[in-house]
Amino acid sequence: MKYLGLALISAVFLIGTCQAETPSQKCEEKYKENAERKACIHHCKYQYYGFIDVNYNIAQPEIRKFSNVLMDYGVVDRSKKRELKKVMHDCAKKIKKEARTGDHWLNCRTSIDYYRCVLTSKLIGPQRFDKAIQDYDKTISV
């Protein structure tokens, strides 16, 4: 009887963690019925990761979070931190400028364009990048 409360609390936490979804699962489920908004899956995931904010902005906190994940998961060596942040900052500026002059302001395409810009940098290997993002996705429960 002494351990009944502890057992119940443990069961509740176990059930909660078993039902948790990753950002990938949550975002794919959210947009699977809407073909026009499938481009937003990427933005949705990046928002959960903290790489882009809800208003499609990419500022210092988002760049810091993204660069830390890439370094933590071995995509970019820590000795190239300054170079990586410069690439990310330049990409963010470029994407914002293109969005202002194009027919779209900041929208779901913004995060896709930003992702592509960062990925085409010589600092980043696409295979390691994708694996790092997938591994990071598994560490987050929503």
From Swiss-Prot:
Keyword S-adenosyl-L-methionine: no
Tissue spec: Female salivary gland.
Subcellular location: Secreted
Main location: secreted
Cystine crosslinks: 27-44, 40-108, 91-117
Molecular function per GO: molecular sequestering activity; odorant binding; toxin activity
Keyword Ligase: no
Job of this protein: Inhibits contact coagulation pathway activation in the host by sequestering anionic polymers, such as dextran sulfate and heparin, and thus blocking interaction of protein components of the pathway with negatively charged surfaces. Inhibits dextran sulfate-mediated autoactivation of host coagulation factor XII (F12). Inhibits dextran sulfate-mediated activation of host factor XI (F11) by activated F12. Inhibits polyphosphate-induced plasma extravasation at the injection site in mouse model, probably via inhibition of bradykinin generation in host skin.
Name this polypeptide is given: Salivary protein 15b
Naturally occurring in which organism (per UniProt): Phlebotomus duboscqi
Name of encoding gene: K03
